[in-house]
């Protein structure tokens, strides 16, 4: 076997590999000898089939198997001998021209192929004790707890029928409706016994406003225009009319925030309800603060660990990111111009994001490997169970899906590993707490999540 390195450019390597026909033939003969005692052919006793006859019958298929095995073994040796860590699966270019390929399968030609690989960079880790980050802290105020409980109360408030009354803002109007665009009904444009909470802005602009003043038994024609960014593209920006029949009008009834109200929500008292709400708000704030400090930590790692990353990994990450961007724009019926940019500029920006993600992923993986940070099978199982609970009635199907799909299981393990490495780094870094308001905590949160 001859191996010649033909490229050593950055993280890319290429090799020309030649395996003699004699070596391939010897391997093929050995496999045919194994087959001799296994195959049954008419006219021959078991185990007595001549190897020459086996070669005529099975020669090409055996040689094909030998070539595949030889390529895999040779590639493995090259990677091992050079101490490479592969970024992606190797690319193998085998002979494609028919005479050459036939000659290989018939055992009369040397195997000559090209191997292209992309390797992971060697990463020099910085001193994590030099990293300084702020951890934002928000104290949950009584006012925030009271506001949250009031929202819960409003969502659970009873409604009382307005006998002969006219609908006001805040009332619940129950309607049947049929919608028309250009005089024709459209999919999803009909509904029966639909509750509309006036003033909630739960329907397209102008719909709720035109229901003010209606009464039970009333019939109205509503004229509206679908938003330009409406999810259903065929309706976006179009004028529509809705023929509406009012079934009932109900006003919000009285509701007292007391122990009895708390019991309707599964709490033994109003005080216990407040404790539960405070804990939930505190948990939400802690999650947001975690994202902020994680973003700051990743920014610091990105600044202190600049190195070339495998183009193939960047392309994979960019493809995933870009696909989601296009899907989101399509779902909202928006364009890059609507976002104040061009497709070219957006591509450049998201490619930078993809490169950052790949680089940080490699850094975190290196930190985890050097410090023996691992995710246990129990932790993965608990995470899968948690995901399965999000699909009531389908838990078993979800569990089986993850059990049968290694890629899906890896998607569960990866974030668990990342959070463990982040915890490890935060133990080493200089973390100072800073008390801020709720508004300051959630400022630019979406940008933080996208960049992280």
Swiss-Prot record:
<dbReference type="InterPro" id="IPR005215">
    <property type="entry name" value="Trig_fac"/>
</dbReference>
<protein>
    <recommendedName>
        <fullName>Trigger factor</fullName>
        <ecNumber>5.2.1.8</ecNumber>
    </recommendedName>
</protein>
<dbReference type="GO" id="GO:0043335">
    <property type="term" value="P:protein unfolding"/>
</dbReference>
<keyword id="KW-0963">Cytoplasm</keyword>
<dbReference type="InterPro" id="IPR036611">
    <property type="entry name" value="Trigger_fac_ribosome-bd_sf"/>
</dbReference>
<keyword id="KW-0143">Chaperone</keyword>
<dbReference type="InterPro" id="IPR008880">
    <property type="entry name" value="Trigger_fac_C"/>
</dbReference>
<keyword id="KW-0132">Cell division</keyword>
<feature type="domain" description="PPIase FKBP-type">
    <location>
        <begin position="170"/>
        <end position="255"/>
    </location>
</feature>
<comment type="function">
    <text>Involved in protein export. Acts as a chaperone by maintaining the newly synthesized protein in an open conformation. Functions as a peptidyl-prolyl cis-trans isomerase.</text>
</comment>
<dbReference type="Pfam" id="PF05697">
    <property type="entry name" value="Trigger_N"/>
</dbReference>
<keyword id="KW-0697">Rotamase</keyword>
<dbReference type="InterPro" id="IPR001179">
    <property type="entry name" value="PPIase_FKBP_dom"/>
</dbReference>
<dbReference type="InterPro" id="IPR008881">
    <property type="entry name" value="Trigger_fac_ribosome-bd_bac"/>
</dbReference>
<comment type="similarity">
    <text>Belongs to the FKBP-type PPIase family. Tig subfamily.</text>
</comment>
<dbReference type="GO" id="GO:0003755">
    <property type="term" value="F:peptidyl-prolyl cis-trans isomerase activity"/>
</dbReference>
<dbReference type="InterPro" id="IPR027304">
    <property type="entry name" value="Trigger_fact/SurA_dom_sf"/>
</dbReference>
<dbReference type="GO" id="GO:0051301">
    <property type="term" value="P:cell division"/>
</dbReference>
<dbReference type="InterPro" id="IPR037041">
    <property type="entry name" value="Trigger_fac_C_sf"/>
</dbReference>
<dbReference type="GO" id="GO:0015031">
    <property type="term" value="P:protein transport"/>
</dbReference>
<dbReference type="GO" id="GO:0044183">
    <property type="term" value="F:protein folding chaperone"/>
</dbReference>
<keyword id="KW-0131">Cell cycle</keyword>
<dbReference type="Pfam" id="PF05698">
    <property type="entry name" value="Trigger_C"/>
</dbReference>
<dbReference type="GO" id="GO:0051083">
    <property type="term" value="P:'de novo' cotranslational protein folding"/>
</dbReference>
<dbReference type="GO" id="GO:0005737">
    <property type="term" value="C:cytoplasm"/>
</dbReference>
<dbReference type="GO" id="GO:0061077">
    <property type="term" value="P:chaperone-mediated protein folding"/>
</dbReference>
<keyword id="KW-0413">Isomerase</keyword>
<dbReference type="GO" id="GO:0043022">
    <property type="term" value="F:ribosome binding"/>
</dbReference>
<dbReference type="Pfam" id="PF00254">
    <property type="entry name" value="FKBP_C"/>
</dbReference>
<dbReference type="InterPro" id="IPR046357">
    <property type="entry name" value="PPIase_dom_sf"/>
</dbReference>
